[in-house]
Amino acid sequence: MSLTGGSLHLSSVTSMMLGMLSQNRRARVIAVANQKGGVGKTTTTINLGAAMAESDKRVLIVDLDPQANATTGLGISSRGLQSSVYEVMLQQTTVTEVVCATEVPNLEVVPSSLALAGAEIELVTAFSREHRLDRALETVADDYDIILIDCPPALGLLTINALVAAGEVLVPIQCEYYALEGLGQLVGNVELVKENLNPGLEVSTIALVMYDARTNLSEQVAEEVRTFFGDKVCRQVIPRSVRLSEAPSFGQPITLFDPTCRGAIAYRQLAKEVLG
């Protein structure tokens, strides 16, 4: 059994020991993942993190997508960075050295940059390459209550690193046609990582996003998702909102950009559900 061209080379005992690192942490480490692009993954990561920070949780967002949308969406220019998560993955620096504060109290981010795209190739021959992020986050686990990892849409070494580092997976699903396309593959890949690298991993949360109450389609998709995933689906849905779409261009989460809009209220409620 293999992932990304046979990237599972560690012995089963070593893999299990390394995979158990995340279970001993104080922070909850949540990978926000969906193998489809354009499903509100980064929007959910940013705004869920900001809403959790408002609830006095110490939150770290790890931008593991080379597009760096979570970075810029939190008001940080990826072009002006001296180092980013790319250098962390190559073990050239630490999370502590690259972490950036945001406008939101209690919310920090490990920024990304376009250079991260090269990490997929550079890590191919690296020892214990699936555990680079896991080991890096272990050093700051006591500094945060929640660590959210914004995964790239493709299943490569970056996403595998996120799944190995995480204890749970949150999947945003847009309430639109083809919403479930590729979802079975994602669940299957999570199971592969669980069996081979991280026995504690589970899909814990499904968030319904881009919900349009004016259409029957949104409700039909929501019903289908709830039938498939049961109580893992959050009760709170995230509405389709122009304000949610505008906020990233201003480098702010919706809780700052428009604190009283429907999107901000919805993400605060979603945060309460996820926090439990």
Regions found by a protein language model. Give the residues of each.
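P-loop NTP-binding core
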Residues: 1-276
